[in-house]
Amino acid sequence: MITKFYKIEWREFDARCRRLARKILRDDTIKDIYGISRGGLPIAVRLSHLTRLPLTETPKSTTTVIVDDILDSGSTRESFKNFKHFEVLVNKKEEDIKEWVIFPWEKK
């Protein structure tokens, strides 16, 4: 049972979204944003506001950036392996985060 938590506050959420937005804007092939339900939806909305790119309900493999809250086991990423652009707010392996991640909109 996981008893340790890594809590992301709103300020950190916004800073992470701003970093992702800058990365997205550097790629002129990205035309819209698709948020994976449920965790990716708040991120997709924030990124849409920051980049002024529209949200989409029907992602396209080469022009849509797929966004999710966290990359842990990689199973969700595998589901979107045919998509060129895939971004997450938290990559547990790259960041060496072992705790359970709690986002600002979640209860502990």
Regions flagged by a language model, labelled:
Residues 1-108:
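PRPP-associated nucleotide enzymes
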